[in-house]
């Protein structure tokens, strides 16, 4: 029995694809290993969204290629980088035995059979035809939380983004399929389901001809044993009144939303082809703020082509004024195949980094003040582990791996997956400390 390992890079959407590949291979009799040094076959599920992600994926491929001097026999690249650079990857990285695009990963077992016959395999170009419905998953996350992908692809056509070319047009899954999978995940022990897609708020527009996310959330919340539902990748132009009401009134939906805004200035938003404007963004924020204790996570992009000092200043003031609880700031990455690649003037890297640092400094203080306001209050915490004599976990305000943690001092015997109500005693810029 051959050992197969997988390294999943990039976003949670990739994680789900990796989990499906593992299930396919296990069913075919392969042995799944977590230690790359024990693998006969290693799959790297790559990210190819921006420059840093591409570099990381390529570095991993080169690094893992060195294992071929030892036990490793075959190295396969899947995911976004593979879809985007297909033939080029095979040509430039001789370590690779196969390259599989985003729409072709269900063929993983057949591809391995082919490379074992001595062939080099290239499969790509079918992003729009991906059919992975009904494929089981072997969870790579701890069993108490799981990602639930509700749609594939994107049709938003932002001028800086290559995703529609890599992942295809927006395709919602059928509600009954999502609900079946959600029930299975909860049966396996998931207490938190994290809804993901390139754009979760557009769910249903293609299949049902209307926004169906509120209805989907309502149905998922009926599952016994499920405690938290978390919403990531919401798109500002599709946050409806109905969605806000569902989040507000549904006890299982955590009062947290991840809603990438990208910028505040109308001219920049127009160049980005964001299909929204400052006024609409203000309205969405105000709608969300009507939900008590709502935590808004957002991301902004600095150094977009033509971003003037005045436009950057506008963004700076916007962040100061809106006081988002969670903010990520990215520097614009010039990607071939996007409309913004040809826009002028392109901003110098040094300016982009300076702007990023400026915004993060502002946000650091906002985040600290927000955390400080929690001292003396009680927060429910999902325990995730124990390290250096203290437990750590997440509150409703924290998504896994992207937000902070809550450290919990306790003499009680706790285990990962337990929910406890901690009294917050101390605050840092991104983390909290509590007692239970």
From Swiss-Prot:
Catalytic activity: L-aspartate(89)-[ribosomal protein uS12]-hydrogen + (sulfur carrier)-SH + AH2 + 2 S-adenosyl-L-methionine = 3-methylsulfanyl-L-aspartate(89)-[ribosomal protein uS12]-hydrogen + (sulfur carrier)-H + 5'-deoxyadenosine + L-methionine + A + S-adenosyl-L-homocysteine + 2 H(+)
Domain MTTase N-terminal: 2-117
Protein name (Swiss-Prot/TrEMBL): Ribosomal protein uS12 methylthiotransferase RimO
Any one GO biological process: tRNA modification
Organism in which the protein naturally occurs: Thermoanaerobacter pseudethanolicus (strain ATCC 33223 / 39E)
Domain Radical SAM core, chain residue ranges per copy: 140-369
Enzyme class: transferase
Family: Belongs to the methylthiotransferase family. RimO subfamily.
Domain TRAM: 372-436
């Amino acid at each position: 029995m051959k050992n197969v390992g997988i390294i999943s890079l990039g976003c949670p959407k990739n994680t789900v694809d990796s989990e499906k590949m593992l299930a396919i291979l296990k069913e075919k009799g392969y042995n799944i290993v977590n230690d790359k040094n024990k693998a006969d076959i290693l799959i790297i599920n790559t990210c190819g969204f921006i420059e840093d992600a591409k570099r990381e994926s390529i570095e991993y491929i080169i690094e893992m290629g060195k294992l071929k001097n030892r036990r490793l026999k075959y190295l396969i690249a899947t995911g976004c980088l593979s879809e985007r650079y297909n033939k080029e990857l095979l040509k430039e990285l001789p370590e690779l035995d196969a390259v599989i695009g985003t729409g072709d990963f269900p063929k993983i077992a057949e591809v391995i059979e082919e490379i074992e016959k001595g062939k080099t395999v290239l499969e790509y170009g079918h992003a729009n035809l991906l059919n992975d419905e009904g494929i089981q998953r072997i969870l790579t996350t701890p069993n108490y939380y799981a990602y639930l992908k509700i749609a594939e692809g994107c049709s938003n056509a932002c001028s800086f983004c290559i995703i529609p070319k890599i992942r295809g047009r927006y395709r919602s899954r059928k509600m009954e399929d999502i609900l079946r999978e959600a029930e299975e995940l909860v049966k396996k022990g998931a207490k938190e389901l994290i809804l993901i897609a390139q754009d979760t708020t557009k769910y249903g527009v293609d299949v049902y001809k209307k926004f169906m996310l509120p209805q989907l959330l309502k149905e998922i919340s009926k599952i016994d044993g499920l405690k938290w539902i978390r919403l990531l990748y919401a798109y500002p132009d599709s946050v409806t009144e109905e969605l806000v009401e569902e989040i507000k009134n549904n006890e299982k939906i955590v009062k947290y939303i991840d809603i990438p805004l990208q910028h505040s200035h109308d001219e920049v938003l127009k160049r980005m082809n964001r299909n929204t404007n400052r006024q609409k963004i203000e309205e969405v924020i105000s709608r969300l703020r009507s939900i008590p204790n709502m935590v808004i996570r957002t991301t902004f992009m600095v150094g977009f082509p033509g971003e003037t000092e005045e436009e950057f200043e506008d963004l700076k003031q916007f962040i100061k004024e809106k006081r988002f609880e969670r903010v990520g700031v990215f520097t614009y990455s010039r990607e071939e195949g996007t409309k913004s690649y040809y826009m002028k003037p392109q901003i110098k890297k040094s300016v982009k980094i300076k702007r990023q640092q400026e915004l993060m400094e502002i946000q650091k203080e906002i985040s600290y003040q927000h955390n400080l306001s929690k001292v003396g209050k009680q927060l429910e915490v999902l325990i995730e582990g124990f390290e250096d004599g203290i437990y750590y976990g997440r509150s409703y305000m924290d998504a896994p791996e992207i937000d902070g943690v809550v450290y919990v001092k306790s003499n009680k015997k706790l285990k990962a997956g337990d929910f406890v109500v901690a009294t917050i005693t101390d605050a840092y810029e991104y983390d909290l400390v509590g007692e239970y």
